[in-house]
Amino acid sequence: MKLAYWMYAGPAHIGTLRVATSFKNVHAIMHAPLGDDYFNVMRSMLSRERDFTPVTTSVVDRHVLARGSQEKVVDNITRKDAEERPDLIVLTPTCTSSILQEDLENFVERAQLEAKGDVLLADVNHYRVNELQAGDRTLHQIVQYYIEKARKKGELPEGKTAKPSVNIIGISTLGFHNNHDCTELKRLMADLGIEVNAVIPEGASVHELKNLPRAWFNLVPYRELGLMTANYLEKEFGTPCIDIVPMGVVETARCIRKIQEVINAQGADVNYEDYINEQTLYVSQAAWFSRSIDCQNLTGKKAVVFGDNTHAAALTKILSREMGIHVVWAGTYCKYDADWFREQVSEYCDEVLITEDHGEIGDAIARVEPSAIFGTQMERHVGKRLDIPCGVIAAPIHVQNFPIGYKPFLGYEGTNQITDLIYNSFTLGMEDHLLEIFGGHDTKEVITKGISAGSDLSWTKDGLAELNKIPGFVRGKVKRNTEKFARDRGFKDISAEVLYAAKEAVGA
């Protein structure tokens, strides 16, 4: 166990709660001490949900430690069942309350005797998995529970839908642009003449889960959530799974061609080539833009990418393959799925980084001095400290990345949004320099610290004054070169003289 003040993927119970609260009329009960219950605040504040978060904390306090939890947990489940009338109550411990090693399965069985709705214990090992793995496991568990229940009652529908149809699996609360992506995927499916059989878990009722086997195929747009469920449905009912992420012009076309292949194999007769052609050439602006003079200005510029597997891999491919940008390194914090990530991006970048340590990522960014960063909220902070622009492309994210306006990342409209994000993330031409010449709003002081805490150098007043005279678009590089020169020569204070000496050394 390690103390962390920043985590890319949260603890396991956050993943379980994200899935449970995405469903309609499902209530979650968290068996946890106060302090583990920040999910309610996070969901209502960040994703701007209108409804109250359906999560109740069954608090582990000194009374519970003295007497045991059974009475309190069972009371909370039956009380919420009577008050809220949910279809399902999901009980989850947290990594903290798991230390008590209580028989929660027994508590659930006790509560089920009195509760009118279903009660389920989230089957997750809180020490072994993170938020993303736990979410995937919980979704699979809920789907399996209701399909088995329908099978026992003889209520499982037979056969497929009359027209080609799809289950979109993995849209959840607190996901990165998930609602916009869902709208765009529905629009894409409508264009292709495919009905949407179900979207899970976001907005779905647990009573609809028995209809999942009726779809012709399952689409899993995000690798982090939904693969276990899709694999289960494929194993049980033979429903094909498509896990190609339709992000960027090339991958969207590949995904559509795979859909064509899958539904034609089941008796349909469709050809989507004309649709792909029209969208690529006339509807999506990305293909046209990538050939324009604006985009050619970006050719060879250096960028770094970091995020979850889905978004980091897709962005790396788009930057390198579609826009000609040099990706110095690409990284992910999904260590459990590192092999897939390496396989996807190794030919599109110089180096692959797999880590959960934000300090290591910050240092890697400072080392390569890219023109732009594409990452999470943490990389945005790093970019601000290093004066390098950053486009946010993956969770974890802050409230400004839950936009109210329509901003999908998937499908053809998604390609436009991503192109805008990439282009606007690079500093344009002489922008900084012109602001300084004409006395614009750019009056910020020079940042003199590295990313890793505890810099051993300090700048004198005359040294800073001299550094401020250097144009903004090269100032960061000059500062770093000067600090390297000072370290090599053993200077502790960097004065104007040291700056001049460093300039001469570099010039020589």
Swiss-Prot record:
Instruction: List, alphabetically, the InterPro entries matched.
Output: ChlB/BchB/BchZ, LI-POR_suB-like_C, Nase/OxRdtase_comp1, P-CP_red_C, Protochl_reductB, Protochlorophyllide_Rdtase
Q: Cross-referenced SUPFAM superfamilies, in alphabetical order?
A: Helical backbone' metal receptor
Q: In which pathway does it act?
A: Porphyrin-containing compound metabolism; chlorophyll biosynthesis (light-independent)
Could you confirm whether the keyword Lyase appears in this record? no
- Any GO MF annotation of the entry: oxidoreductase activity, acting on the CH-CH group of donors, iron-sulfur protein as acceptor
- Catalysed reaction per UniProt? chlorophyllide a + oxidized 2[4Fe-4S]-[ferredoxin] + 2 ADP + 2 phosphate = protochlorophyllide a + reduced 2[4Fe-4S]-[ferredoxin] + 2 ATP + 2 H2O
Q: Does the keyword Transmembrane helix apply?
A: no
Q: Residues that bind substrate, according to the entry?
A: 429-430
* Cofactor names: [4Fe-4S] cluster
Documented EC number(s): 1.3.7.7
- Per UniProt, which keywords does this protein have? 4Fe-4S, ATP-binding, Chlorophyll biosynthesis, Iron, Iron-sulfur, Metal-binding, Nucleotide-binding, Oxidoreductase, Photosynthesis
Entry binding sites for [4Fe-4S] cluster: 36
Residues the record marks as active site: 294
How the protein assembles, per its UniProt entry?
Answer: Protochlorophyllide reductase is composed of three subunits; ChlL, ChlN and ChlB. Forms a heterotetramer of two ChlB and two ChlN subunits.
Q: Which HAMAP family match?
A: ChlB_BchB (MF_00353)
Specify the protein name: Light-independent protochlorophyllide reductase subunit B
Q: What is the lineage of its organism?
A: Bacteria, Bacillati, Cyanobacteriota, Cyanophyceae, Nostocales
